[in-house]
Curated annotation (Swiss-Prot):
Comment on bound cofactor: Binds 1 FAD per subunit.
Compartments, as annotated in UniProt: Cytoplasm; Mitochondrion
Native organism: Caenorhabditis elegans
Family matches, as PROSITE patterns: PYRIDINE_REDOX_1
Protein name stated in the entry: Glutathione reductase, mitochondrial
EC numbers: 1.8.1.7
Gene3D superfamilies: 3.30.390.30, FAD/NAD(P)-binding domain (3.50.50.60)
GO biological process terms on file: cell redox homeostasis; cellular response to oxidative stress; ecdysis, collagen and cuticulin-based cuticle; glutathione metabolic process; response to superoxide
Gene Ontology CC annotation, any one: mitochondrion
GO molecular function: flavin adenine dinucleotide binding; glutathione-disulfide reductase (NADPH) activity; NADP binding
Keyword line: Cytoplasm, Disulfide bond, FAD, Flavoprotein, Mitochondrion, NADP, Oxidoreductase, Redox-active center, Stress response, Transit peptide
Factors inducing expression: Induced by the oxidant juglone and starvation.
């Protein structure tokens, strides 16, 4: 009987010219693939549509190649300090082409692993660009598909400003297409993407200028983190040139191919590469969402509820196109939980968008989880918030001429001083934060932090030995 129903369903699908799936996923990025493969574990039929390389932003032009380039730039810093540790090493030459070739080969292998994963999970991989038709089906290269449930996970693309000559620059995705290290670079933006790219280029030897609209970078992060990184960029020993309160007004390309960047505070000449890193827009316009009643905000982000439902029944969305926490692990977690809810009877399974840890691969590093000081004050009131802070010199730089500071902050609330925010600036922040994120998620208190015996000598021990709490200013 079950086989008869399957044959009947397939016959109807063929006769109607529409191929049907229990779950149709539009977008082969981290969130879409994670949700598709998890759905297959529950025995449903799944189709996945993608027009570009599998893996989406993270694998191809985001966190993975970015981390490779960050690691590369770290080696330049190590070489800088080698003499102070007794090594006779100098940086004679850096070959951008070598690391680009190795990085691109690594990404290509990951693309292949994603495709193998889909095949191994029996997810049907449909290559092409998707758009909703008037009848509610999804069209790809002239063929029609329909999902009993349809997931939109198409991600986003970099924003290009409406400025005269803006087309002479490249976007943050284009950074990974550069064939050589630019002799002089201008990066525009104050968010984590701009900060990371500028730091990599500056440390690898490009004369790099970071242009920010206001007086600080990372203004949405905790004030301590924003202040510390901005101050570090202002140091004479930092190879980066920071231009505060600066906006680009015009870009002029000369006959020699070099750019002149006119700004509100001056002119930067002989620029080989201009990189726009001012934000990202969702890739939703080409989907024709209005045909199926999916509502978006004014920026084009898909509006979803706490269960990832859109305004259209049976159509859901996760990832960057929802505008919530543009982070790969968030998209993966939301996508997998969604599949559990839709296909495994877990009707209340959803991602809670709280205490999500993140790291900025800046120079120095930043790690953060939970509420900022300002958010805690707004949520609980100033009288309920207690702050613990520490600023010190990491041991790595105890014997080097070059010095870097580290800074840490715990944001605690209530009489029991529940830790609701952990913010870390300095070497090692990326690797130390994950464990503290678990503690924050579990609701640990300052007393429990204090009862933890420190690992010495480490930077992380500061987080369990801080004393002298203060109130917000």
């Amino acid at each position: 009987m079950l086989r008869f129903r399957c044959i009947l369903s397939t016959s109807r699908s063929i006769m109607s010219g529409v191929k049907e799936f229990d779950y149709l996923v539009i977008g082969g990025g981290s969130g879409g693939i994670a949700s598709a493969r998890r759905a297959r574990e529950f025995g449903v039929s799944v189709g996945l549509i993608e027009s570009g390389r599998l893996g989406g932003t993270c694998v191809n032009v985001g966190c993975v190649p970015k981390k490779v380039m960050y690691n590369c730039s770290l080696h330049a810093e190590f070489i800088r300090d080698h003499a102070d540790y007794g090594f006779d090493v100098t940086l004679n030459k850096f070959d951008w082409k070598v690391i680009k070739k190795s990085r691109d080969e690594y990404i290509k292998r990951l693309n292949g692993l994603y495709e193998s994963g889909l095949k191994g999970s029996s997810v049907e991989y449909i290559r092409g660009r998707a758009t909703f038709a008037e009848d509610g089906t999804v069209e790809v290269n002239g063929a029609k598909y329909r999902g009993k449930n349809t997931l939109i996970a198409v991600g986003g693309k970099p924003t290009i400003p409406n400025i005269k000559g803006a087309e002479h620059g490249i976007d943050s995705d284009g950074f990974f297409d550069l064939e050589d290290l630019p002799s002089r670079t201008v990066v525009v933006g104050a968010g984590y993407i701009a900060v990371e790219i500028a730091g990599v280029l500056a440390n690898l030897g490009s004369d790099t200028h970071l242009l920010i609209r206001y007086d600080k970078v990372l203004r949405t992060f905790d004030k301590m983190l924003s202040d510390e990184l901005t101050a570090d960029m202002d140091e004479e020993t930092n190879p980066l040139h920071l231009h505060k309160n600066t906006q680009v007004t015009e870009v002029i390309k000369g006959d020699d191919g070099l750019l002149t960047i006119k700004t509100t505070t001056g002119v930067i000449e002989k620029v080989q590469t201009l990189i726009w890193a001012i934000g990202r827009d969702p890739l939703t316009k080409e989907l024709n969402l209005e045909r199926v009643g999916v509502k978006t905000d004014k920026s084009g982000h898909i509006i979803v509820d706490e269960y990832q439902n859109t305004s259209a029944p049976g159509i859901l969305s996760v990832g960057d196109d929802t505008g919530k926490f543009l982070l790969t692990p968030v998209a993966i977690a939301a996508g997998r939980r969604l599949s559990h809810r839709l296909f495994n009877g877990e009707t209340d399974n959803k991602l809670t968008y709280e205490n999500i840890a993140t790291v900025v691969f800046s120079h120095p590093l930043i790690g953060t989880v939970g509420l900022t000081e300002a958010e805690a004050v707004e949520k609980y009131g100033k009288d309920e918030v207690t702050l613990y802070k520490s600023r010190f010199n990491p041991m790595l730089f105890a014997v080097t001429k070059h010095k870097e500071k580290a800074a840490m902050k715990l944001v605690c609330v209530g009489k029991d001083e529940k830790v609701v925010g952990v913010h870390v600036f300095g070497v090692g922040s990326d690797e130390m934060l994950q464990g503290f994120a678990v503690a924050v998620t579990m609701g640990a208190t300052k007393k429990q932090f204090d009862q933890t015996v420190a690992i010495h000598p480490t930077s992380a021990e500061e987080l369990v030995t801080m004393r002298g709490g203060v109130k917000p200013e």
